[in-house]
Regions:
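Blade-level signature of beta-propeller repeat domains, shared across WD40, Kelch, NHL, RCC1
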Residues: 102-108, 206-259
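Loop/turn-rich, solvent-exposed surfaces of beta-rich toroidal or solenoidal domains
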Residues: 97-99, 142-186
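Conserved beta-strand element within WD40/beta-propeller blades
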Residues: 6-11, 45, 52-56, 94-98, ...
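Per-blade loop-tip surfaces of WD-repeat and WD-like beta-propellers in eukaryotic adaptors/scaffolds
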Residues: 11-32, 57-73, 104-119, 182-192, ...
Length: 259
């Protein structure tokens, strides 16, 4: 979506930038950060300004303002392995995906000499590192979903809605035949069960919001890709969890889009 010609790469213990326009191995030597120890990096994401968040299978997260230097902030292991990572365009919010829950982290500093700065720009104080919000499903919903899907909970990498000058308002992920969206405002207000679901007959392979909107969701199933309106997601109840969406092509559920 931008004119950027390079992309970020990572291995178990290194972060680097690849520029396809270069000759040879395409590696930008000045933007290589290699660690002696095996950090087991697993996912990365960038902000609009190019700040970089990197997560690992150990569960920790590093925040950089650019490649080739030490991280500005290191957030210690938060639990399970982090399999997916996303950041808001302005860098305020970091979203990590673990197998059975999500982690939402506020990267803006609230106290000390660097108040108002992001953890990408300045290090957090020793005793003021951000505390992540753990986003999980209600245990009763999980129990029924696992029975219906005949498989344990396993989230796909969660994403914010994105767009040019768009404000992040929603989060989407999936597990088995279920898509789940979280409402960011409801999360921050502490509302119980701030998510809605959509059930399919088949496993959801991938999902994301349509670019520039949080009202439409693109869903990839084993044999087709469709776009559905977010308004068709339902509050999690015994009925909405047990009843799959039967016809993807009904006019009530498909967004009329010329693209």
């Amino acid at each position: 979506m931008t004119g950027e010609q390079t992309f970020l790469g990572l291995s178990n213990n290194a972060l680097f930038r690849i520029d396809p326009r270069l000759s040879g191995n395409k590696l930008v030597e000045s933007q290589l950060k290699q660690y002696v120890s095996k950090n087991d990096f697993s996912a990365a994401a960038t902000t609009e300004k190019g700040y970089i968040a990197v997560a690992s299978n150990k569960g920790d997260i590093r925040l950089f303002d650019r490649l080739g230097i030490n991280a500005k902030t290191h957030i210690p292991a938060l639990g399970e392995a982090i399999m997916g990572l996303d950041v808001s365009a302005d860098g305020k919010w970091i979203l990590g995906t673990c197998k059975t829950y999500l982690l939402l982290i506020d990267a803006e500093q609230k106290e000390g000499k660097n108040v108002g700065k992001l953890g990408f720009e300045k290090s957090f104080g020793k005793d003021s590192k951000p505390r992540p919000r753990r986003l999980g499903l209600n245990p009763s919903h999980v129990a029924q979903m696992q029975v219906e899907a005949k498989s344990p909970l396993s989230f796909t990498p969660a994403k914010f809605n994105t767009g040019l000058d768009a404000q992040e308002t929603s989060i989407i992920t999936s597990t088995g035949p279920f898509m789940i969206t979280w409402n960011l405002k409801k999360i921050l207000r502490g509302i119980q069960n701030p998510y809605t679901i959509k059930r399919y007959n088949e496993e959801v392979k991938a999902d994301n919001f349509r670019f520039g909107s949080d009202k439409s969701v693109i869903v990839a199933l084993p044999n087709e890709v469709n776009m559905v309106a977010k308004q068709t997601f339902k509050k999690p109840t015994r009925e909405s969890i047990s009843t799959p969406m039967r016809n993807l092509k009904s006019r009530s559920s498909i967004v009329d889009s010329r693209y």
